[in-house]
């Protein structure tokens, strides 16, 4: 049985930061993810920052985290929200190339010292005398001194589309069932919170002549507070459709 100081279950944004923080503090760390396509995956709106969140990305960066650095690498558009108001409410938001974001963060994880990234599903947390002793995956067992559970919405996940319900992780990915039961058997209450994701459309199906273009100047501000860190990106435009409830009901966008 391989031994680790810390095992992190789940390689979403939280799991990635936890694993990197542990490894960078000198702890032998294992990061578990069901599949490579789940690492740093943006299942909802592919953006980083924004109102109420942009400052958190900066705080993660100040603590040595990776999200801000990676967001700068994969950004296709940046905008400072609330720029007409006072500096206290300025909020940097970056729209991301979700595929590039994944590629860049995987590169970072794979070269990080003290960190192993394995594509295995964690099925059980080993607990003895109320202390975590290890984890069991669909392929192996690992001994550890501590475990971080960062599974997001994968625990017994469901997808709801109108009247249609399907047992699944986000975007049709595999959900975690055995780990849910393991956590419950150890007295941990599992609750679900519903999130909403807008429908996606093909960009080639849009009649842009009916939309308004907002010219967005390339931001000189990055999430990473390092002067000169800018990377070349192809800036995308923002398009607006004005309507309301009637336009939504009649499909006249």
Which role fits each region the language model picked out?
Residues 224-253:
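Functional-site microenvironments in short loops/helix caps that host divalent-cation chemistry
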Residues 20-126, 146, 150-170, 174-180, ...:
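Conserved N-terminal/central alpha/beta ligand/cofactor-binding core
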Residues 2-14:
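Beta1/beta-strand and adjacent pyrophosphate-binding region of the FAD-binding site
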Residues 2-4, 138-146:
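Core beta-strand elements of the Rossmann-like FAD/NAD(P) dinucleotide-binding domain
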Residues 126-141:
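Conserved beta-strand-loop-beta-strand element in the redox core of flavoprotein oxidoreductases
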Residues 116, 141, 231:
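Short aromatic/basic micro-patch
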Residues 8, 18-19, 132:
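Conserved phosphate-binding elements of NTP-dependent enzyme cores
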Residues 12, 153, 246:
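Flexible, active-site-proximal loop/turn residues at the rims of small-molecule/cofactor binding pockets
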